[in-house]
């Protein structure tokens, strides 16, 4: 098996998300191509060491001028390549690190969100309502199964998200009607699949081995199920997958333009706006951390910079003489 295929397979065995597997494979390929350019020949990772990784990371920081987050992503991927795929611990690294910028997220106010949602429809609108109304990542929205939404308790169970953690978040009352309609749409797709003998969806790795029959259950169908069937890329069976997050991202950009919003608006902007709005309305930083699923509260504290500072409540002197 080729080394890049080994990266993909190792990610699958460890039950990493498809996005993580794709990212790790991409960085492994970029690294090996860079080594080839430097040495003039292909070199197997077993013949490389920490100095090669340090040189590549330094190249990213000094020549390509990547962001600190990008360099850290590359580092994680290469540590995975050596430790988990090749089986070599390359020890501590001493590369030049990219400078981390002081990033303040772009957020929308309530009027802007209302305008944005007004130009969205169907699954695009519902996905955005869950990102803004429950603080979900776009990947978490599209990973939801029918069973993860409890309409009675008004909760959403986010399973095995970033960092392989589960968490419970609120289900916005305003989204319940749309959730019911979407679940009914999925039920119709499920009934069609049962009739054609192809009611099957992909299950999480460990659970798939323990309970393979669950792949044919309506409870495990994606809430944002694709309208078209597709074949599993590895095993070849015909079934359903969820809609692609890129579709809603394109819709958001178009909706923002039509609404006359001149800020940069992405799926993550809605999550940022959720966090900021909760804080401005009296939520604690700890509550926001738990709702967002952050491991480190320092990650959450960046939203404190987005809230309206108390100093802005001071009346401008110009107002007194106007």
Could you tell me what each predicted segment is?
Residues 1-322:
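Conserved catalytic core of the tyrosine transesterase superfamily
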């Amino acid at each position: 098996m080729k080394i890049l295929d080994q990266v993909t397979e190792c990610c699958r065995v460890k039950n990493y998300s498809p996005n993580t597997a794709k990212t790790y494979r991409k960085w492994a390929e970029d690294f090996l191509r860079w080594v080839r350019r430097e040495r003039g020949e292909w070199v197997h990772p077993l013949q490389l060491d920490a100095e090669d990784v340090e040189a590549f990371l330094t190249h990213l920081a000094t020549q390509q001028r990547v962001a600190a987050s990008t360099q850290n992503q590359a580092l994680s991927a290469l540590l995975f390549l050596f430790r988990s795929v090749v089986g070599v611990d390359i020890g501590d690294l001493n590369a030049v690190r990219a400078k981390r910028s002081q990033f303040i997220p772009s957020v929308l106010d309530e009027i802007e969100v209302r305008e944005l949602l007004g130009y969205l429809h169907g699954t695009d609108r519902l996905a955005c309502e869950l990102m803004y109304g429950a603080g979900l990542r776009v990947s978490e929205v599209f990973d939801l199964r029918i069973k993860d939404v409890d309409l009675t308790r008004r909760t959403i169970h986010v399973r095995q998200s970033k960092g392989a953690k589960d968490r419970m978040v609120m289900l916005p009352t305003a989204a319940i009607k749309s959730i019911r309609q979407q679940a009914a749409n999925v039920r119709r797709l499920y009934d069609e699949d049962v009739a054609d003998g192809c009611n099957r969806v992909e299950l999480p790795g460990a659970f798939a081995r323990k309970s393979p029959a669950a792949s044919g259950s309506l409870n495990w169908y994606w809430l944002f199920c694709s309208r078209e069937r597709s074949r599993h890329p590895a095993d070849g069976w015909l079934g359903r997958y969820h809609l692609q997050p890129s579709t809603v991202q394109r819709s958001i950009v178009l909706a923002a333009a039509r609404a006359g919003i001149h800020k940069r608006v992405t799926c993550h902007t809605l999550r940022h706006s959720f966090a900021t709005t909760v804080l401005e309305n009296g939520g604690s930083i700890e509550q926001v951390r738990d709702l967002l699923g952050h491991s480190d509260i320092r990650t959450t504290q960046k939203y404190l910079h987005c809230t309206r500072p108390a100093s802005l409540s001071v009346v401008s002197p110009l107002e007194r003489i106007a």
